[in-house]
């Protein structure tokens, strides 16, 4: 196995692990505060590792032509960096287990910041995944027989269903209120099975992956059309 192939596998593994942790972190009350802190640390470590593995892209941000797609990708990445940093710092301030001995002040502000940034992390990271979804589709397409295009249409239909339910779950789970800061406290139904909770959040993630993917395709098409006109 080539070095490039090994690095690609590590990248996929890291990104998959981040996706799982992101979903679990959203169920703060259901997994317990101590577990939430450990998962948060794990997420931060994986986030740093993700940037190390993708350092070539970071170095090339200011190089080349600035298209709408690149601008969308870069702005999303910068916002994720900001919200993740705020989540990590505010999480350390609020810690009652791992960093409790530090006795950091500012808990009230940290609680507001942690809640806002936590939900924006979820949305932005889902969009980020959607931006790169074409690459994942490309990898999966190699496994699908070319003489069976029906499988691609089934996959597209399934993604539309997930995104459609994601709209409902987005509203039902009150994410607009959490993202806007209108609601300062998160409500959890303690009797609800965590599986149902996670399924709703998977659907919401699917919604933003869907939006990120097709918006990225639209921006690429706009750039392609401009290039054709100029020729």
Regions found by a protein language model. Give the residues of each.
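Membrane-embedded alpha-helical bundles that constitute the cytochrome b-like, heme-associated redox core
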Residues: 1-231
């Amino acid at each position: 196995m080539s070095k490039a192939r090994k690095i690609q596998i590590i990248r996929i593994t890291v990104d998959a692990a981040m996706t799982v942790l992101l979903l679990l972190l959203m169920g703060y009350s259901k997994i317990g505060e101590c577990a939430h802190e450990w998962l948060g640390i794990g997420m931060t470590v994986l986030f740093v590792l993700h940037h190390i593995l993708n350092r070539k892209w970071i170095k090339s941000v200011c190089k080349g032509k600035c298209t709408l797609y690149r601008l969308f990708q870069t702005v999303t990445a910068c916002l994720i960096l900001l919200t993740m940093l705020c989540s990590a710092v505010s999480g350390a301030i609020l810690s009652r287990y791992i960093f409790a001995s530090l006795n950091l002040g500012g808990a009230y502000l940290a609680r507001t910041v942690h809640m806002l940034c936590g939900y924006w992390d979820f949305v932005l990271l889902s969009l980020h995944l959607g931006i790169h979804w074409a690459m994942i589709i490309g990898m999966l397409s190699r496994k699908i027989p070319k003489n069976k295009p029906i499988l691609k249409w089934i996959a597209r239909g399934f993604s539309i269903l997930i995104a459609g339910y994601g709209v409902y779950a987005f509203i039902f789970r009150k994410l607009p209120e959490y993202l806007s800061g209108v609601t300062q406290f998160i409500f959890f139904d303690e009797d609800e099975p965590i599986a149902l909770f996670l399924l709703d959040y998977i659907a919401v993630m699917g919604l933003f992956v869907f939006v990120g993917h097709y918006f990225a395709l639209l921006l690429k098409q706009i750039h392609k059309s401009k290039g054709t006109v100029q020729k």
